[in-house]
């Protein structure tokens, strides 16, 4: 099988539980690749079971970059991702590797292809300031504050989306302009051709797999994983890491807010809702190879075309 040497970036996208990792590994057996994770949950250390992170043996044999790169209490912005992804893409080309960006965080893919607005960059001091504000006031109150400053942005951001809320407030604090004002004038982050592969199984298959996969997570010690996280005094339910699907609901259960049956039901429903949002976004993607299963032969032909 020929090695892809042209400077082309592969986007391997799909909703949660669609088999992206499996196909990425199969492609690594066909090409000299660099697998780069595009997943805002897989970045966190110690959050393995609930994020469906590839196991240690798999990661050792088929390294995935941008996995396990920060602690759950850390803040990791889209700017951090752009910096890290760009570095990995350049490294791939320097080593004559095919960069395959694989994951389910739609926003990250969108930014790499279409660019980001000319927003002021965050700093460690600024991040600390707004994370402290989040701890003191809570997500809902900060969303109300944002609505007074920038109602347009507030209407687009869910009241529980703490990361985007504090980023919008931070932008206003740093620039004196709202994030809505500054959005515009975008240019692509990636200057190379992009080939997109989208895994899109039937919805009923995804729903079944989501439930089966989560029940397996429970058997594999998901609650023990969350209990271990709760022992870290720096972690709380307003952090982006703990707001990941599954962890938020398990945190509520371990705090006695909901019972186990309700927790399981809430996690499965939330995961299916995430899946629906991902599918909606993926349907708007153009010029992509869409597969309803991990069809390796079609993917290889597409990459080589």
Curated annotation (Swiss-Prot):
Catalytic activity of the protein: adenosine(37) in tRNA + dimethylallyl diphosphate = N(6)-dimethylallyladenosine(37) in tRNA + diphosphate
Site (Interaction with substrate tRNA): 105
Subunit structure: Monomer.
GO BP, sorted A to Z: tRNA modification
EC number(s) from the headed UniProt entry: 2.5.1.75
Main EC class the enzyme belongs to: transferase
Keywords, sorted A to Z: ATP-binding, Magnesium, Nucleotide-binding, Transferase, tRNA processing
Species, as recorded: Vesicomyosocius okutanii subsp. Calyptogena okutanii (strain HA)
Family: Belongs to the IPP transferase family.
Record carries keyword Glycosyltransferase: no
SUPFAM superfamilies noted in UniProt: P-loop containing nucleoside triphosphate hydrolases
GN (gene name): miaA
Protein name: tRNA dimethylallyltransferase
